[in-house]
A protein has these predicted regions:
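Acidic/polar N-terminal loop/beta-strand segments that form early-domain functional surfaces
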Residues: 30, 42, 105-107
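Short, N-terminal intrinsically disordered low-complexity segments that are rich in Pro/Gly
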Residues: 6-10, 40, 77-81
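Glycine-rich NAD(P)-binding loop of the Rossmann-fold in SDR/ketoreductase-type enzymes
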Residues: 45
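Iron-sulfur-associated redox domains of electron-transfer enzymes in respiratory
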Residues: 61-267
C-alpha cells in the first residue's frame, strides 16, 4: 500500500493516519525532519481509506467567496501580542463564549510546535503569534470530530492543507458548528532545522532558550526578525527568518502547493 507517490505530494496533514481503522499508520520524521505517514504492513488491511482521504492528491472543497475584510482588534495589547490585527482572537472569543473549543498551533516545552485544544482564553492565547515551523497534528482531527458529535461549537485554525485534511477527515459529520480559519501561508519549515537553530543559539549565547518570538514587534510593527530569549535575556536575530523567507527550509510539498490561490478551503 502506497499513500503518496513522492514527498512533493504529501503535506503532512496526518488525515491518513487518523482515518486508519486499524491504527496501522504512524507519522515519522524523515532525514529533513518532516513528518510522513509510515504503514505497519502487519496491521494494514489494504482498505484504501488512507489513499481516498488525501485532500492534497484528490482535491478539496473550495470556498469561492471573494469578499474581503480588514479587521483590527479594539484592544491595543491584544493586537501587540498577536501576529497582526488579532482577528483570530476576536473570532475565537466568539467560540469560547459559546462554551466551544478552539484548536491551533502552540509551542511545547521544548519549543516544538503541535496542535492542541483550548476551551479557555489562557490556553487559546498560546495560539497567538506566528509559528514558522510545521506543527504536529497528533490526533487533532479525531478530537474535533468528537467535539462536533457532542454538539459543541468548534474553531480550527491552521494552514490551508491542514484545514483541507480536516474537512476530508470529517466527511459526512455535521459541521454546522465548525468554523475553520487558514493562514496566508508562506510554507512550513522543517522542525529539525528549528531545533538545530535553537541549539546553535544556546551554544552561541551560553544558556538555555526560555522564550521565542518569530515576529518581535518591539523593534517595529513590520519587522521580520525573530527574538530568542536565552536565560531570559533577549536577543534579536534574523538567521532563521532569513532562511524561511528565502524559501530554503520549506517542506517539499510547499513548492507544489495546491492551495496557493484565492479558492481557499477554510471559511
Amino acid at each position: 500500500m502506497q499513500i503518496f507517490p513522492s514527498k512533493s505530494e504529501c503535506c503532512g496533514c496526518s488525515a491518513c493516519k487518523q482515518i486508519c481503522p486499524k491504527g496501522a499508520i504512524a507519522m515519522k520524521p524523515d532525514s529533513e525532519g518532516f513528518l510522513y505517514p509510515q504503514i505497519d504492513v502487519s496491521l494494514c488491511i489494504e482498505c484504501g481509506a488512507c489513499q481516498k482521504i488525501c485532500a492534497f492528491q484528490n482535491g478539496y472543497e473550495k470556498n469561492h467567496s471573494k469578499t474581503a475584510y480588514a479587521i483590527k482588534h479594539k484592544d491595543f495589547n491584544t493586537r501587540f501580542t498577536s501576529r497582526s490585527g488579532a482577528a483570530f482572537v476576536a473570532l475565537s472569543d466568539y467560540i469560547l463564549n459559546k462554551k466551544g473549543s478552539v484548536y491551533g498551533a502552540a509551542f511545547q516545552d521544548d519549543f516544538s510546535v503541535s496542535h492542541i485544544r483550548a476551551t479557555d482564553r489562557y490556553v487559546r492565547d498560546k495560539f497567538k503569534g506566528s509559528k514558522y515551523v510545521q506543527s504536529d497534528m497528533k490526533d487533532t482531527f479525531k478530537s474535533v470530530k468528537n467535539d462536533l458529535n457532542n454538539d459543541m461549537y468548534v474553531m480550527f485554525s491552521g494552514t490551508a492543507c491542514q484545514v483541507a485534511g480536516l474537512k476530508r477527515y470529517l466527511g459526512k459529520c455535521d459541521t454546522s458548528k465548525l468554523y475553520t480559519c487558514d493562514i496566508a501561508c508562506h510554507g512550513v519549515p522543517s522542525p529539525i532545522i528549528w531545533k538545530e537553530y535553537l541549539k546553535h543559539c544556546e551554544k552561541k549565547f551560553c544558556g538555555k532558550v526560555t522564550k521565542a518570538d518569530f515576529r518581535d514587534k518591539t523593534i517595529g510593527w513590520n519587522t521580520h526578525k525573530e527574538a530568542i530569549w536565552i536565560d531570559d535575556n533577549k536577543h534579536i536575530l534574523n538567521g532563521y527568518t532569513y532562511l524561511f523567507y528565502e524559501d530554503d527550509i520549506e517542506r517539499p510539498s510547499c513548492y507544489n502547493c495546491k492551495y496557493s490561490n484565492i479558492d481557499r478551503p477554510a471559511d
